[in-house]
Each structure stands twice: as structure tokens, then as C-alpha cells.
């Protein structure tokens, strides 16, 4: 008698080309896989973690007692004679990371402390600098002396400008030389006035007080010269 069927044959394991068959097979096999894993945990008191990605990219997981607990145990708490080196390597790496974090934080703290001390010192110097006017020049420190010199220079500049302004108001043709580096003297109203000195330098005014200009006008007395 001839057999009507081909009998039991071994199915070739290849990827399915038909999309609908692939999705149906995945759903059935996934459920069967998780069921077998659950039975294995019950029979052998084993701890299992499974993560499955579907063809569409969805994630499915199974774990006993919990997937997260088992993953943490695998990453950081590996024990056993065969995994001693792995555990030591992980511990060393963890210590190195902690040391690096500690060094960075310590550097930031030291930097902030230095900035704080610098700001406090500047505030103290500013407070002391404001008291220079009530002390003798011999009693001033560096910061107070610097403040005094700066204020006096500003005051001298204001006085010079005010004096020149008043002179120009009384005699528009009068010119006072500046402390510029110009080599040639300025010619004003027929006379030469040196520009190598400031208006209030130690040598006094930039021209002889009794000098009579060509136009016969006495500078100091503002009267016609002899």
C-alpha cells in the first residue's frame, strides 16, 4: 500500500518573507518562549531575564523576580569564582570615577574659596582707600596712596581746565601751552609761549609774568605795557 502523505519532514529555519506570517509566528513563539521561561523558573527556582525586540521595533521583556533587579545584579554585583576578575575590574573603574568626581568638585570649591577671599580683600581695600583724606600722607598704605594720587590728578585736571576757561573768557587771544610732545612753540598774538610745560607745573606759568607782547599788553596787569 502506497503512503498518501510525505510523512514528517524537518522544516528549514529561514526568515519568513510574508509579512503577515512573520507577525503571527512572532506572537505565538514569544508567548511560548515566555511560558517556557516561567516553567523553568518554577521547576528550578531559577532567575531569568529576557528582552525581546519585535520586527516592528517594540520591546517585550520577562523577568523573575524582576528584569531591573536582575540587570542591576548582572552589571554591578557579579559574584562567583569565575567572575572574580570582572568584579575587581568593575570596582576599580567605579573607584576611579568617584576619585575623578571628587577631584573636580574639590577644584571647584578651592576656586570659589579663592574668589571669595579675593573679593573680601578688595572690599577691605576699598573701605580703607576711602579713609585716605582723614590721614597724613605718611600714614597711608599702598591702596590709599594710589587712591589719593588718582583723586589729586583728577582735581588738577579740573583746575587746569577751569583756569584756561577763565583766561579765555577775559582774553580770547591768550593761549596757554599744554604738556604735549610738540617741539615747536605756539605763536599767539605776536608772542611765543612754550608748550613744554603744563599750566600749573612747578616752574609756574609757561610765560614770563612781566613779558610784554608785541601788541603792548601786560598779561598780569591786563593793562597796556610801557
Swiss-Prot record:
Short name of any one Pfam family annotated for the protein: SRF-TF
Residue stretches in coiled coil: 95-132
Highest taxon, organism lineage: Eukaryota
Positions with biased composition (Basic and acidic residues): 108-127
Gene Ontology biological process terms in this record: chloroplast organization; embryo sac development
Location of this chain's protein in the cell: Nucleus
Sequence segments annotated as region (Disordered): 108-131
GO cellular component, one term: nucleus
Keyword annotations from UniProtKB, A to Z: Coiled coil, DNA-binding, Nucleus, Transcription, Transcription regulation
Annotated GO MF terms: DNA binding; DNA-binding transcription factor activity; protein dimerization activity
Chief place of localization: nucleus
Residues covered by the MADS-box domain: 6-66
InterPro entries noted in UniProt: TF_MADSbox (IPR002100), TF_MADSbox_sf (IPR036879)
Knockout or disruption consequences: Embryonic lethality when homozygous.
Record has Nucleotidyltransferase as a keyword: no
Biological role stated in the UniProt entry: Probable transcription factor that controls female gametophyte (megagametogenesis) development and chloroplast biogenesis during embryo development.
Protein name as it appears in the record: Agamous-like MADS-box protein AGL23
Source organism of the structure: Arabidopsis thaliana (Mouse-ear cress)
